[in-house]
Amino acid sequence: MLDAVLEDWTTADVPKETHAALSLLECMTLRPMELDASFVEGLRESGLDEFKMREAAKVCFQYNLITRMADAFDFPVLEGKQQARLTKMLNFGSTRLRGKNADPLWTRSADGRIRPTGVDRGWQTMLSTKGLTDPPLRHDVAAFVTAQWRLSHKDIPQLSDALTTYLKKLSLYAYRILDEEVDALRAEGYTDEMLCEITVVGAFTAALVGLDQLFDVLYD
């Protein structure tokens, strides 16, 4: 069954509920803005309750985050203190992502979006914690990435051409990022460590779009 799903999940002979879960994953990943009330109702009719939707969505969020970083992190591996600092940067939200058992299922974030409480806690920490990049830049990165998916042309931060190109690809098709585009950022003064911080924030924010969309439909 797994081979059939990997070849083409839309025609694979899988249970109706599994098919619905796969359709949710695809929509969150490729067409998050199409995730509306009618789409969610179709999932319910196929046997997915809110718990199953939430669990599938959390898996999808982490998949989209990890794959973007894997596609983007194609420059030399850092060593020594640099690697230790990067590890800290990648992990600084990990305990917050897990949250506490007493946490509510969702929270309305400072940006007005509804999302899992632990995920929002990790995201807010990622934007504000001390790093080599300034928090205002990280907020601009997050706003720019969100705008790529939501097709918003209002209040988009003005970024350099090199950073704009990089973040557009990171948002929509990270596998297309070129070495030359990373080099252009280095030429602007970004170190590899700073690029890693920007990439983590951008990938996290892009992965949030589908998750936010689902939670808005479920709980707003």
Question: Language-model segments: which ranges?
Answer:
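Hydrophobic alpha-helical segments
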Residues: 1-220
